[in-house]
Amino acid sequence: MKEYSIFYADDDEDDLMFFEEAVYSLSGDEAVKINLHLVKNGENLLEVISQTAANNSVVFMDLNMPAKSGFEHLEDIRSNSLVATTPVIMYSTSADKQNIEKSKKLGANYYAVKPSSFRDVIKLISKALSLDFNTDTAPPNDFLLNKLAI
């Protein structure tokens, strides 16, 4: 059985529930176990990742959160030696090129625009879990994870 840990930081309750349902539908596969850690605004994200991150961990991070933006949380992750190599996917409703480029510049592994359909969220999460972040690096044309998940 393959085991994964997913950390999802978002301040929107509906987005958290939607993502959680998608993860649980994937967890129904007996060959996959997913430990999901929901963080409501990112404030204790570093602490949660530091305490529970393991191999096959990935962070999905919303850009627009109160107090600190997803960009600021990404900078915190990349500057903390305990969690700096944890894969991060910036996960936002925004498809703005500046946000995508800034995410890449700050060290995100991928950027994903939040899909509106449940099926597409499942495909996106599945694609993220299929990546080997130890060897896979996002070439400039493939930084947008949505393109790879279709």
Task: List the predicted regions and their residue ranges.
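Alpha4 helix (beta4-alpha4-beta5 surface) of REC/receiver domains from two-component response regulators
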Residues: E3, E72, A95-Y110, A128
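A Lys-centered signature of the CheY-like receiver
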Residues: K114
